From Swiss-Prot:
Entry superkingdom: Eukaryota
Residue ranges occupied by any Fe2OG dioxygenase domain in the UniProt entry: 290-388
Modification after translation (UniProt): Ubiquitinated by SIAH1 and/or SIAH2 in response to the unfolded protein response (UPR), leading to its degradation.
Protein source organism: Mus musculus
Protein name: Prolyl hydroxylase EGLN2
């Protein structure tokens, strides 16, 4: 019998949603993210501090290379922080519940896929209403029945033009209703996949985020920044005796997306903004009203990485970290550069390969200490942090924030709190 303290595999715990944010997702595909893999009773129990419930993935092989291992992390260094707010600080031991249960293992061994939960949103978690249950479906059926009955009872007295007008009118009404109710692709991605993943795991991996064409343009702009000498060594807030390059080995540039030669980076940020905007109001008590500039980072491939750290251990306002990777044909066994996340209170390590067109999202606070393993090839990433309004306002009153943390206002339409 396995020990409950034994590290568990996370390779099935981060299921992937097919398709990219730039393409329209069918309802059946949009639903394939988290729900198809999670046991029904477990999803709402996530993210209650000190909760004893556990969670895992059921049957199915997710389309991701994010895995978990028992790899021992490099020791956490105390008292250092990056200019981007990456702080190295002792971690709290308390956290959310463990990730895997024996019941889930039993289901997986039997090849059983749990039935998708059908719940409304809940304050302590929950899931989105199934997009396949369209609010307009009943009206369409009623309209179809009405049209059919009209054709049977009217006889010769009803003209074909009247029937045609009625059908046309009802069709236009249905089309308008679809347009009003049907969520956009970023909205479906946010509600059906990112929000449940963040509530349940605190980590979300989305492949094929932009698509090969736009992703390739972003990569070209980042490479131009590097070869144009625009990148500078990443800095540390705390200046100690230890050389900064022994803590972090990346070169960075802060980009708004409006600069010449950075339009595609701006388009990337617009896509990420759109997804996060639809998450607003559904991720705990956070009120997301802005973000940092985009931090373009390059590890030059000389064996440097970034030691284990927490992005926001002291409440500087950042609540969500989004990282977009740009590394084509990347092989971590050859090139290194693996990102490892150590979810607080869970006996797992999430290994995230920095693959091209992959978007990684995770909580910025002490729940997700992480590190970048030494990279032996040029490794590119773009990172942005989203602010919680209340914490950010408090941080402004307390601290003089580093220049790289000056926020960019992002218009966020706060959705109505789901019921």
């Amino acid at each position: 019998m396995d020990s409950p303290c034994q590290p568990q595999a996370l390779n099935q715990a981060l299921p992937q949603l097919p398709g990219s944010v730039s393409e329209s997702l069918e309802s059946s595909r949009a639903r394939m993210g988290v729900e198809s893999y999670l046991p029904c009773p477990l999803l709402p129990a996530y993210h209650r501090p000190g909760a004893s419930g556990e969670a895992s993935a059921g049957n199915g092989t997710p389309r991701t290379t994010a895995t978990a291992t028992t790899t021992t992390a490099s020791p956490l260094r105390e008292g250092f922080g990056g200019q981007d707010g990456g702080e190295l600080w002792p971690l709290q031991s308390e956290g959310a519940a463990a990730l895997v249960t024996k019941e889930c293992q039993r289901l997986a061994a039997q090849g059983a896929r749990p039935e998708a939960p059908k719940r409304k949103w809940a304050k302590d978690g929950g899931d989105a209403p199934s997009p396949s249950k369209r609010p307009w479906a009943r009206q369409e059926n009623q309209e179809a029945k009405g049209e059919s009955g009209m054709g049977c009872d009217s006889g010769a007295s009803n003209s074909s033009s009247s029937s045609s007008n009625t059908t046309s009118s009802s069709g236009e009404a249905s089309a308008r209703l679809r347009e009003e109710v049907q969520p956009s692709a970023p909205e479906r991605l946010a509600l059906d996949y990112i929000v449940p993943c963040m509530r349940y795991y605190g980590i979300c991996v989305k492949d094929n985020f932009l698509g090969a064409v736009l992703g390739g343009r972003v990569l070209a702009e980042v490479e131009a920044l590097k070869w144009g000498g625009r990148l500078r060594d990443g800095q540390l807030v705390s200046q100690r005796a230890i050389p900064p390059r022994s803590i972090r080995g990346d070169q960075i540039a802060w980009v708004e997306g409006h600069e010449p030669g950075c339009r595609s980076i701006g388009a990337l940020m617009a896509h990420v903004d759109a997804v996060i905007r639809h998450c607003a109001g559904r991720l705990g008590n956070y009120v997301i009203n802005g973000r940092t500039k985009a931090m373009v980072a390059c590890y030059p491939g000389n064996g440097l990485g970034y030691v284990r750290h927490v992005d926001n251990p002291h409440g500087d306002g950042r609540c969500i970290t989004c990282i977009y990777y740009l590394n084509q044909n990347w092989d971590v066994k050859v090139h290194g550069g693996l990102l490892q996340i150590f979810p607080e209170g869970r006996p797992v390590v999430a290994n995230i390969e920095p693959l091209f067109d992959r978007l990684l999202i995770f909580w910025s606070d002490r729940r997700n200490p992480h590190e970048v393993k030494p990279a032996y090839a040029t490794r590119y990433a773009i990172t942005v942090w989203y602010f919680d309004a209340k914490e950010r306002a408090a941080a402004r009153d307390k601290y003089q924030l580093a220049s790289g943390q000056k926020g960019v206002q992002v218009p966020v339409s706060q959705p109505t709190t789901p019921t």
